[in-house]
Amino acid sequence: MINIILAIFIGGGLGSVLRWFISLRLNNISSNIAIGTLTVNCIGALIIGLGLAYFNKSTHLDPAWKLMLTTGFCGGLTTFSTFSVEVVYLLLDGKLGWALGTVLLNLFGSLLMTMLAFVLMHEL
């Protein structure tokens, strides 16, 4: 159990530092879109997809490596990667309606909660 905790901890730290570095370098390119954030979200989605596809074929590997990459690194880099893989699994299972619903709920739910936070902070 301690090796899994350490794996997630190390992966999360590395992902978080990489997210900070990429955002620092790229977010000032445009005042309209956070290019760094978009970049880490896309990179995280690619990495988690590649990682899970690899780990599904390589069952001999210690589960700590999978958790270091997915929960740790991609979780630290971005939570969008987890969201993406969940939607892809729904699509692969032929659950188009659920996939679309998941996309819409995550997108609009996140936007609404962020808006709520801004409204609440403005009121304080």
Swiss-Prot record:
**Per the UniProt entry, what species is this protein from, by scientific name?**
Photorhabdus laumondii subsp. laumondii (strain DSM 15139 / CIP 105565 / TT01) (Photorhabdus luminescens subsp. laumondii)
| Classification via InterPro entries | FluC
Q: Kindly give the membrane topology term recorded for this protein.
A: Multi-pass membrane protein
Give the binding site residues for Na(+): 75, 78
**Record field: transmembrane:** 4-24, 33-53, 72-92, 100-120
- Please identify the protein, giving its name as recorded: Fluoride-specific ion channel FluC
Task: Give a yes or no for keyword Membrane in this entry.
Answer: yes
The record's principal subcellular location, in a coarse class, is membrane
Question: What is the gene name?
Answer: fluC
MF GO annotations: fluoride channel activity; metal ion binding
Xref: HAMAP family = FluC
Described by its record, this protein's role is as follows: Fluoride-specific ion channel. Important for reducing fluoride concentration in the cell, thus reducing its toxicity.
Q: Where is the organism placed in the taxonomic lineage, from the top?
A: Bacteria, Pseudomonadati, Pseudomonadota, Gammaproteobacteria, Enterobacterales
Where does this polypeptide localize? Cell inner membrane
Q: Can you supply one Gene Ontology CC term for this chain's record?
A: plasma membrane
Q: Which reaction does it catalyse?
A: fluoride(in) = fluoride(out)
Q: Which UniProt keywords apply?
A: Cell inner membrane, Cell membrane, Ion channel, Ion transport, Membrane, Metal-binding, Sodium, Transmembrane, Transmembrane helix, Transport
UniProt lists the family membership as follows:
Belongs to the fluoride channel Fluc/FEX (TC 1.A.43) family.
**Notes on activation and inhibition:** Na(+) is not transported, but it plays an essential structural role and its presence is essential for fluoride channel function.
